[in-house]
A protein has these predicted regions:
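Hydrophobic h-region of N-terminal signal peptides that target proteins for export
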Residues: 3-15
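A beta-strand edge to alpha-helix "cap/lid" segment located at domain peripheries
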Residues: 13-57, 62-158
Length: 158
């Protein structure tokens, strides 16, 4: 989800809605939706706060992430990233998250805004695949891409 943190922060677009929107497309269990939405937000905010607990909790042990550069990441690598990114990122949060449930699988698509400490803003679009195993929701796969500022208006929740 947030694999290209610092590289993506070079974009110059500056847009942040007043609050993140997290919605279920189709039917969902309210408690599952709330947990996934809160977890996505915690992971995004960890980029700036340095909190390693959020990715450690929500990423499955067999997690594989693909960054916008094509690099693969494991759970251990992703859990360690907030400690590094928080040195250069001052703000990171979800703009929106769309969640689609398919039984014990949830597919999420979202957008995050990031701001570096030197004032550059960037946006990442991402997809996360969640599985509910042994009663616990965790991300097993994610992929992100930097959103060009010229495409920002076209990427909206409506």
């Amino acid at each position: 989800m947030f694999i290209a943190f610092v590289a993506a922060a070079a974009a110059v677009a500056s847009h942040q809605p007043p609050g993140a929107i997290c919605v279920s497309i189709g039917q969902s269990n309210a408690a599952d939706l709330q947990y996934i939405c809160e977890s996505e937000r915690a992971w995004s905010r960890a980029v700036a706060s340095g909190d390693i607990d959020a990715p450690t909790r929500i990423l499955a042990n067999d997690y594989v992430g693909i960054g916008s550069s094509g690099k693969r990441f494991t759970k251990a690598e992703m859990a360690a990233q907030p400690a590094r990114t928080s040195k250069s990122v001052s703000y990171s949060d979800n703009d929106y998250v769309r969640v689609r449930f398919f039984g014990s699988t949830a597919m999420n698509q979202g957008r995050d805004s990031l701001r570096t400490k030197d004032g550059h803003t960037s946006h990442l679009i991402w997809t996360d695949t969640w599985l509910k195993r042994d009663g616990k929701w965790q991300i097993v796969q994610s992929q992100d891409a930097e959103l060009e500022s010229s495409n920002l208006a076209a990427d909206n929740l409506q």
